[in-house]
């Protein structure tokens, strides 16, 4: 029993921290603990409004959300990937919020893939919304190709931005010509503002922001460093978020179910393992080919030596020997 408890304690160390009073908290940057943190409309709304920097005229008022939204279009082996948090708002905006701990060779492809699905899904839901259905026939024809606003937000617990001077960047579609002609005074503008990616580099945030000066700072510090590194607050949204991460408030059965899926990033893990295997296989093949070349070169050198010795023994000049060896 002692050995079992020690094993459990070591396992818990990965995603549980304990304060000086002995209170245990979940670290919110794992797959399941992130959902525990985000399982609240007010939290999602506040995270989105602060990270996107939305003013009162554009802030999100009401929303619905769904965890592990499946990408229900064809994927290899019919094995769907899932969006961490899918959010739709009352004013017909669609967001995907991802918490990621691992990079891999096709991480950028993954970002584009998720956004492509998000765009299609957003259009699908937009066309079936009460708003769109309430439009007149000609208005619906006019808006046949209209896309709603779709934003992908990626919280990356690894370095992803090229610059170490920023922790957040917006990616969008730009014209190469406009980018080439842009300057500091007249920067290039995205061709499409409805569809964009917000990339948050949490390691950069930790280096750049040592204290909390905004609501965005609170959320990013909580996500990157955990609940022990943010102050207790009387703000109901902040207090509620921190409280949801208390281990003591969780039902034991729910906690066990959560624990079983804590590291369930199947596709990411498999991609990283497969990449390592393929690189090892390629390195082994290259080493084998190098050894084969080395053996062939040694055999050729030994053969040339014997030919040269024979030619010299029958009186062929040094120039003639060189000419003969060159003819192969």
Regions found by a protein language model. Give the residues of each.
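Short, charged alpha-helical interaction segments and adjacent helix-coil junctions
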Residues: 2-25, 86, 95-100, 204, ...
């Amino acid at each position: 029993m002692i050995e079992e408890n020690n094993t459990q304690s070591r396992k818990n160390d990965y995603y549980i921290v304990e304060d000086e009073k002995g209170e245990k908290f979940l670290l919110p940057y794992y797959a399941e603990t992130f959902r525990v943190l985000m399982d609240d409309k007010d939290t999602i709304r506040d995270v989105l409004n602060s990270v996107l920097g939305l003013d009162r005229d554009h802030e999100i008022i009401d929303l619905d959300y769904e965890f592990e939204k499946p990408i229900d279009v064809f994927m290899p082996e019919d094995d769907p990937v899932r969006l961490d948090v899918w959010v739709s708002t009352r004013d017909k905006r669609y967001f995907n919020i991802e918490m990621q701990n691992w990079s891999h060779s096709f991480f950028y492809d993954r970002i584009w893939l998720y956004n492509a699905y998000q765009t299609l899904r957003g259009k699908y839901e937009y066309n079936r919304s009460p708003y769109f259905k309430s439009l007149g026939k000609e208005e619906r024809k006019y808006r046949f190709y209209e896309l709603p606003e779709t934003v992908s937000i990626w919280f990356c617990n690894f370095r992803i931005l090229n610059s170490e001077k920023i922790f957040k960047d917006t990616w969008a579609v730009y014209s190469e010509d406009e980018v080439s002609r842009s300057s500091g005074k007249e920067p290039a503008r995205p061709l499409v503002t409805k569809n964009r990616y917000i990339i948050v580099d949490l390691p950069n945030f930790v280096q750049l922001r040592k204290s909390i000066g905004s609501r965005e700072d609170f959320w990013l510090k909580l996500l990157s460093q955990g609940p022990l590194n943010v102050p207790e607050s009387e703000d109901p949204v902040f207090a509620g978020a921190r409280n949801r991460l208390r281990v003591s408030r969780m039902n034991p059965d729910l906690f066990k179910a959560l624990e079983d899926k804590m590291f369930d990033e199947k596709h990411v893990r498999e991609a990283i393992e497969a990449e390592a295997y393929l690189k090892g296989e390629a390195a082994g093949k290259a080493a084998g080919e190098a050894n084969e070349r080395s053996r062939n070169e040694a055999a050729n050198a030994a053969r040339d030596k014997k030919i040269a010795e024979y030619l010299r023994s029958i009186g062929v000049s040094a120039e003639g020997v060189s000419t003969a060896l060159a003819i192969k």
